[in-house]
Amino acid sequence: MAAGTLYTYPENWRAFKALIAAQYSGAQIRVLSAPPHFHFGQTNRTPEFLRKFPAGKVPAFEGDDGFCVFESNAIAYYVSNEELRGSTPEAAAQVVQWVSFADSDIVPPASTWVFPTLGIMHHNKQATENAKEEVKRILGLLDTHLKTRTFLVGERVTLADITVVCTLLWLYKQVLEPSFRQAFPNTNRWFLTCINQPQFRAILGEVKLCEKMAQFDAKKFAESQPKKDTPRKEKGSREEKQKPQTERKEEKKAAAPAPEEEMDECEQALAAEPKAKDPFAHLPKSTFVLDEFKRKYSNEDTLSVALPYFWEHFDKDGWSLWYAEYRFPEELTQTFMSCNLITGMFQRLDKLRKNAFASVILFGTNNSSSISGVWVFRGQDLAFPLSPDWQVDYESYTWRKLDPGSEETQTLVREYFSWEGAFQHVGKAVNQGKIFK
């Protein structure tokens, strides 16, 4: 298992590739990205650093055994395990294919489009429009490939997914607003599935998708450029003496002291993001405390404790019950792939957990299965339209609102919440269930 030190600068998406790979493989990596241990632009130009890494580039990795390697893809490969690299020659070749595709096809247009919005690069209108069209082509290509796949290569995350996600990261955060990305549902589903994996979240944190396409800011670009030195006037010059005293005071006020440490471009972009609004804030306060029910459900017997608590405290005016059924059972083949559909949906709805609960069950066997479940939502309507990020999967299901007082609803809730019962409306045996809580 690899172990060593990664030199980089903060929020370097190229370094994220190796760090996410290490989360999967168990490689032990120490990150040096800030003074006094590492100062980008200085440390990487010292003779000592250049002896180990002649190109002076970061990220750069130094193993505890003295092994040194630079270039982000090489580092990510080194700290990976066999599953990430591709467990067969064919899979390994496909992983390299997508890693190469990310560098050759995605990085150029992504940089041309995103960098001006961060103030890193000057804006060229025609180049930006060309980059947008190229990004559309790339997202469409991925969308077609992912139509019948959960991940880019095989049925599990590989370096292909890690690399392409990291390369697309700033596009999704900065410019791919909902109206632009909605044409690529399979790509969006895959991207959200990946970034919500625990190994991705450990490095990326909570990724906020773009709500409004960022534009080039000429002022920000000008501020990021090195300032030219202006010739000093001699002390006591005639022009200075002739200035009114009030004008001198105004000049002193205008010359505000510079902050001790300026934010880099990534930090500026993050700081400029609007604070997320609670999509349920408009609803009146409810007496039903969902978290308390979830604790009962997790720690107590479902039939004797959790269900009685649910019906005793359920607020039918503040909450609603829904039955959902997957629309395309004929497309379900291997049961583990069907389970991935459920798990992926849950991961993409992570921000909905405080206001929803669900029990979704896979019934049947390979090539003869179905998916259905019972959901609890805050409010009287389906929650998915409240956020574009929640709309990836829900149209793949039929939704029927349940009457909390009906005998049918009582039976459905009991059977789905306990995973026990006749399930007469299904006609197949329970294979396995998933809980969204």
From Swiss-Prot:
* Protein name in the entry: Elongation factor 1-gamma
Q: Which Pfam families match?
A: EF1G (PF00647), GST_C (PF00043), GST_N (PF02798)
Record PANTHER family: ELONGATION FACTOR 1-GAMMA (PTHR43986:SF1)
Source organism of the structure? Rattus norvegicus
Domain GST N-terminal per the UniProt entry, residue ranges: 2-87
Supply the gene name.
Answer: Eef1g
Question: What role does it play?
Answer: Probably plays a role in anchoring the complex to other cellular components.
One GO term (biological process): translational elongation
Q: Which residues carry this modification: N-acetylalanine?
A: 2
Assembly, in brief, is:
EF-1 is composed of four subunits: alpha, beta, delta, and gamma.
Ranges for the EF-1-gamma C-terminal domain?
A: 276-437
